[in-house]
Curated annotation (Swiss-Prot):
Residues 34-44 have a biased composition (Polar residues). Residues 54-71 have a biased composition (Acidic residues). It comes from Schizosaccharomyces pombe (strain 972 / ATCC 24843). InterPro entries: Conidiation-specific_6, UPF0654_domain. Residues 24-33 have a biased composition (Basic and acidic residues). This is UPF0654 protein C22G7.11c. Belongs to the UPF0654 (con-6) family.
Length: 140
């Protein structure tokens, strides 16, 4: 059973998170108002009959609350939930990105991407091009 103090701390963090929708912040505020009385001092009297009251608010969950901009893009990525590749623009590998890094570890990461069945073809293609660029830079 979740610790009520930690649940409240999470709800309070939601209020201060800029990546959370206004609707989610309002629900967190409502939750804090209805559940904080006495619980902050360790009094768990709000748990009636041993039931876990922490999940009562999930019944009215609105999937649109996760989308926080006009385009309907998930704040953590695109419509599919995937985060854009930070290497999408410009050169795939810049020299200053490799400074201070073990080049073999970087190459290993790209090779792992190419062999990972959970990675898109587009990401595998980018990894292949990045490997080629690294090879060109290290040979030069």
């Amino acid at each position: 059973m979740p610790d009520p103090n930690r649940v409240l701390a999470g709800k309070k963090a939601t209020l201060h998170n800029p990546n959370v929708s206004q609707q989610a912040k309002e629900r967190a505020e409502d939750y804090i108002e209805s559940h904080s009385s006495g619980q902050e001092t360790g009094d768990y009297s709000a748990q009636a009959g041993g039931r876990d009251l922490d999940y009562e608010d999930l019944g009215d969950y609105d999937e649109d609350a996760d989308f926080d901009n006009e385009e309907g893009l998930n704040v953590l990525g695109d419509e599919s939930g995937f985060v854009d590749d930070p290497m999408k623009t410009g050169d795939l590998v810049e020299e200053d990105q490799l400074e201070g890094k073990n080049i073999e570890n970087v190459r290993g990461g790209y090779k792992a991407t190419m062999h990972n069945p959970n990675v898109s073809k587009q990401a595998k293609t980018r990894a292949q091009r990045a490997l080629e660029e690294i090879d060109d830079e290290t040979q030069a």
